[in-house]
Amino acid sequence: MEKLVDDGLANAIGLSSFNITQIQRILSEARIPPANLQIELHAYFQQQQLINFCNKHNISITCFSPLGSPDIGQFFSMFGESVVVPKILENPVVRDIATKHNKTSAQVLLRFSLQKGLAVIPKSLTPTRIRENINVFDFTLDECDMKNLNGLDKSPAGRLFDLFVSKGAKKHPEYPF
């Protein structure tokens, strides 16, 4: 990747689903430090320690599944898998804040991450939801809203994509990814 940057074929190097130990190893061995880390991050899995580490090392963060992947259960059902996914969008705290601001739960969750200085990449297929996801810059969550949303963190127990990782992968020396 460093050669791609040197050759002008890439502007920066990014990482995906790395933990602190893995990033430390990259920082100690790489000539060009990573510019961005893409990780699962949402109200139930906030990863504050990893955010603090990245901030200290000038690594921006992009949140995948900022809405908690509400439709992922349907995806797995196509393969005969039954996966119960927590419905962050239906959480009463999130809904109350959405009502207070006359916004949707999705808009509140996106705004929550944005106010923390994080980039978000929600997956949406419908034009209505795509427009809804863009309309998050006309309101601000107050200190009480942020505190209540911060209180939803379940730490590692809130990780959704752990539900979908094969049992064999969990034995890998680099796990969790």
At which residue positions do the language-model features occur?
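Beta/alpha (TIM)-barrel catalytic core signal, keyed to glycine-rich beta->alpha loops juxtaposed to Asp/Glu
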Residues: 1-177
